């Protein structure tokens, strides 16, 4: 067992990095995809399944867990790991993004943000210190600073104000977090689509000497080339010996291109959310299983996959389930999508280790471009 939180950069291939984050509850192989367990569940999945697919860590959402069942109750029940039966690492976000996007009647100032719950309209206050306190009660292994995430496009003045506020909040979160052996607090780079603000944010966070650094405020409405451009500007500023986490991203294409730039960790609801709506991600691109072409196709989504949902169930059956709005359809497609994401990450890690990431990148893009197999 690892007593401390450590990050080891094991190998590189071009800009892509192979590493390992170690902590008492386990080791995270990077680049890593973290399935999102918003309210203590990866939607439509058993956590045993999530683990079997290759996930080393999952994500929990501070905003949702704060509203129900509540952090004090989670703490009384032994913490989030005990409650949900997941003994491996958990990362919790700060709740900031959901406060800004879901809650009503927000009042934001230097102290924090006051907001109404989207569940029952109750009034709550989230400060940097309270966010860290809640994450401590949840007993997560990696905790995120409270930040203000601005949706793009936005005026530069507003982006700059939010970035500077987030920097000050990062320092307060660092003080509130203190020293917790075996755990880590990450800062979040903000600055919207403004290169100089991104650099200022990264430099300011670097001075705090945190255990890891996230890039936030992307995949919030901007084109992919803008997101990648911000990574090109931001990542050279961040220390190479610390893990880098791109928040809320994304599609397999986003992940592959971000790995090429040096990102180590990802999370996104896309594989499970898309699965619940009949969309499958495969080695030959996206497949909308609701389309009529699949109605009498007895072939599986991917006969090469180790996942039963991908290998053993016909497209015709998956089509029937999704068109009938049966819960099993969303369950099987979520299972398939998470399997594909983890297979992609394993392929990325192996290719970096073998020094052939550029070839893997080109081969993967080429396979996606071919499109789905021909109809029957």
From Swiss-Prot:
UniProt GO MF annotations: tRNA-guanosine(34) queuine transglycosylase activity
Record keywords: Glycosyltransferase, Queuosine biosynthesis, Transferase, tRNA processing
Entry EC no(s): 2.4.2.29
Pathway(s): tRNA modification; tRNA-queuosine biosynthesis
Residue positions binding substrate: 93-97, 147, 190, 217
Location of the active site: 93, 267
UniProt GO BP: queuosine biosynthetic process; tRNA wobble guanine modification; tRNA-guanine transglycosylation
Annotated catalysed reactions: 7-aminomethyl-7-carbaguanine + guanosine(34) in tRNA = 7-aminomethyl-7-carbaguanosine(34) in tRNA + guanine
Quaternary structure annotation from Swiss-Prot or TrEMBL: Homodimer. Within each dimer, one monomer is responsible for RNA recognition and catalysis, while the other monomer binds to the replacement base PreQ1.
Main function: Catalyzes the base-exchange of a guanine (G) residue with the queuine precursor 7-aminomethyl-7-deazaguanine (PreQ1) at position 34 (anticodon wobble position) in tRNAs with GU(N) anticodons (tRNA-Asp, -Asn, -His and -Tyr). Catalysis occurs through a double-displacement mechanism. The nucleophile active site attacks the C1' of nucleotide 34 to detach the guanine base from the RNA, forming a covalent enzyme-RNA intermediate. The proton acceptor active site deprotonates the incoming PreQ1, allowing a nucleophilic attack on the C1' of the ribose to form the product.
Protein name per its UniProtKB record: Queuine tRNA-ribosyltransferase
Classification lineage: Bacteria, Pseudomonadati, Pseudomonadota, Alphaproteobacteria, Hyphomicrobiales
Gene name per UniProt: tgt
């Amino acid at each position: 067992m690892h007593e401390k939180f450590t990050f080891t950069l094991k190998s590189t291939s071009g800009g892509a990095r192979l590493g390992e984050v170690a902590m008492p509850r386990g080791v995270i192989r990077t680049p890593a995809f973290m399935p999102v367990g918003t309210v203590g569940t990866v939607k439509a999945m058993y956590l045993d399944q999530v683990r079997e697919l290759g996930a080393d860590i999952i994500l929990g959402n501070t905003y949702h867990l704060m509203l129900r069942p509540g952090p004090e109750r989670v703490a009384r029940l032994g913490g989030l790991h005990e409650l949900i039966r997941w003994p491996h690492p958990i990362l919790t976000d700060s709740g900031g993004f959901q406060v800004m996007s879901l809650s009503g009647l927000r009042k934001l100032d230097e102290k924090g943000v006051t907001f109404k719950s989207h569940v029952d309209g109750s009034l709550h206050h989230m400060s940097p210190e309270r966010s860290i306190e809640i994450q401590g009660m949840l007993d997560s292994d990696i905790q995120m600073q409270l930040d203000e995430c601005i949706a793009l496009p936005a005026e530069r003045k507003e982006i700059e104000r939010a970035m500077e506020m987030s920097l000050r909040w990062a320092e307060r979160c660092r003080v509130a977090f203190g020293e917790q052996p075996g755990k880590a607090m990450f800062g979040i780079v903000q600055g919207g689509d403004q290169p100089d603000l991104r650099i200022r944010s990264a430099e300011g966070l670097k001075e705090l000497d945190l255990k890891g650094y996230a890039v936030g405020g992307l995949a919030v409405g901007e084109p992919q080339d803008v997101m990648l451009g911000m990574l090109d500007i931001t990542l050279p500023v961040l220390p190479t010996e610390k893990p880098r986490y791109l928040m809320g991203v994304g599609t397999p294409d986003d992940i592959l291109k971000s790995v090429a730039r040096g990102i180590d960790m990802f999370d996104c609801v896309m594989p499970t959310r898309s699965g619940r709506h009949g969309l499958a991600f495969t080695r030959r691109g996206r497949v909308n299983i609701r389309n009529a072409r699949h109605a009498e196709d007895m072939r599986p989504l991917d006969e090469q996959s180790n996942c039963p949902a991908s290998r053993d169930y016909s497209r015709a059956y998956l089509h029937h389930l999704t068109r009938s709005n049966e819960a099993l359809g969303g369950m099987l497609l979520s299972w398939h999508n998470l399997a594909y994401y983890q297979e992609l990450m394993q392929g990325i890690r192996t290719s970096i280790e073998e020094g052939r990431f550029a070839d893997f990148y080109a081969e993967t893009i080429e396979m996606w471009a071919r499109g789905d197999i021909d109809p029957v």
